[in-house]
Swiss-Prot record:
Lineage, uppermost ranks: Eukaryota, Metazoa, Chordata, Craniata, Vertebrata
Residues at which Ca(2+) binds: D96, D98, D100, K102, D107
Protein name: EF-hand calcium-binding domain-containing protein 3
Organism the protein comes from: Bos taurus
Region (Disordered): 413-438
Phosphotyrosine: residues carrying this PTM: Y279
PANTHER family the UniProt entry points to: EF-HAND CALCIUM-BINDING DOMAIN-CONTAINING PROTEIN 13
Keywords annotated in UniProt: Calcium, Metal-binding, Phosphoprotein, Repeat
Gene: EFCAB3
UniProt-listed SUPFAM superfamilies: EF-hand
Domain EF-hand residues, every copy: 47-82, 83-118
Ranges of compositional bias, category Basic residues: 426-438
Domain of life: Eukaryota
Length: 438
């Protein structure tokens, strides 16, 4: 179908009635204060006008400088957005505010600055479809959000537009009372849609703006619901680090059998450096793991596990599901070996840092050994999902270094004494020889 035929078929006729987005929304906002309903829109500043003009210039337009069906379809294609011609035609009719059959810059500006259309885009009404086709009147907001997301506009224009809509969202929703007793929007704050991903990038931006102005109590509720909705993941970034914190064994420990506390105290008296971590957590023996790491091939620079996988991939050209399942354990083992090697190298670096800052003296000078726990916490590694150096490791390292230093100092002092005695003996001999000659 030619472009001229499309224009003739979907000619934008003047509207006899402007689509009303106000009546239903105002009825469905029981918590909105009267002062908010009577809120007068602020005039756009010159910099904001230029920012919206930059956004309008991105659209393909006809010879008169207005957005038509063909220009809107081309703009959507540039942004990778798919919409039928019928839906685009309806969106253009909704955007024709002055009913002149065209969407000019004035219409464009009135749509994007309208409070009710903005709410319809960022907070879809209950019972409406979440896609563009089932929720007409928000296409310009979605395109504007896409322009910001892809950085298709100048940096200054993006900053002005984002600041404008952030303030608009705060002003519009500041008077909403989100009580659970109200109907409609009052029930929407967390529970119904918390597990539903945002229907669009504009809604995602609105959610981010809403989180930024939440009170602490509401934020904790939001995070609790979010945790319930997220399925468990094998990613190391989804795991909570186990910090080396000591329990308060002097007070009452709820939910712990008394015999466990007695066992804990017994282990504490028996092995003061080894009781807590080995009792509560299955810590990895770094020396054993370091000995089990396979050496890197000097020619290729890779371990034998990775080279084995490489050979398996080269031998087979057509892979089946069974072949992929067979190679999966090899890949897992090679990945674990690689992560372990990285962790061990980082562990050596952290030990060198501890030696340079003289961490053992910090606890002695401050008369507090908590610095061992603090330093251990900051050696956490996601490669092995635990801290690379426990307080016990640091104390054993200090004992080893101090023992060697003491041995060296004793050896050096004894050698200095012998040298001093030798020099004294030589001086006495020379003095006696001079006296004999006299």
């Amino acid at each position: 179908m030619a472009v001229s035929e499309i224009k003739a078929k979907f000619k934008l006729n003047p509207l006899t009635k402007v689509p009303n987005f106000h009546s239903r929304r105002d009825k469905d906002l029981p918590g909105l204060l009267p002062c908010q309903l009577q809120h007068k829109e602020r005039k756009l500043s010159p910099s904001q006008m230029r920012a919206f003009q930059d956004a309008y210039n991105f659209f393909n337009k006809d010879k008169t400088g207005c957005i038509d069906l063909h220009g809107m379809m081309c703009t959507l294609a540039k942004l990778g957005m798919n919409l039928t011609k019928h839906d685009v035609h309806n969106e253009l009719r909704c955007a024709d505010i002055d009913q002149d059959g065209k969407v000019n810059f004035s219409d464009f500006l009135k749509v994007l600055t309208d409070k009710n259309r903005f709410l319809k885009a960022v907070v879809p009404e209950k019972g409406t479809c979440l896609d563009l086709a089932g929720n007409p009147g928000i296409l310009l907001f979605e395109i504007l959000s896409k322009l910001i997301e892809t950085s298709a506009l100048p940096k200054k224009a993006i900053s002005e537009i984002v600041s404008y809509f952030r303030r608009k969202f705060q002003e519009t929703t500041s008077g909403m009372v989100w009580s659970p007793d109200t109907t409609g929007y009052g029930k929407r704050r967390f529970k119904p849609d918390i597990c539903t991903p945002p229907s669009s990038s504009t809604a995602a931006f609105a959610n981010a703006a809403r989180i930024a102005i939440m009170k602490e109590k509401d934020l904790f509720k939001f995070l609790d619901e979010l945790k319930k909705c997220n399925p468990p993941s094998d990613s190391p970034y989804s795991k909570i680090p186990i910090f080396p914190l000591f329990p308060n064994v002097d007070g009452v420990v709820m939910g712990k059998p008394f015999k466990d506390i007695q066992k804990l105290e017994m282990l504490k008296r028996k092995e003061p450096l080894n009781f807590f971590e080995n009792y509560f957590f299955h810590k990895k023996d770094w020396k054993t793991q370091e000995a089990n790491i396979k050496p890197v091939d000097p020619t290729s620079g890779y371990t034998t596990d990775i080279l084995t996988i490489d050979q398996m991939l080269k031998r087979k050209q057509n892979w089946t599901v069974a072949d992929a399942a067979a190679i999966k354990p090899h890949v897992k083992r090679a990945t674990e070996t690689y992560n372990l090697g990285i962790a061990l190298e980082h562990r050596k670096q952290m030990l060198n840092l501890w030696r340079k800052i003289r961490g053992d003296l910090i606890g002695i000078e401050s008369k507090n050994e908590s610095f061992y726990d603090t330093f251990s916490t900051y050696t956490w590694s996601w490669n092995v999902c635990q801290e690379l150096l426990s307080p016990k490791d640091l104390k054993l390292y200090d004992a080893h270094v101090n023992r060697n230093a003491l041995h060296n100092s004793v050896f050096s002092s004894s050698s200095d004494i012998s040298e001093c005695d030798t020099d004294t003996g030589r001086k006495r001999k020379r003095k006696g020889f001079k006296g004999f000659r006299q």
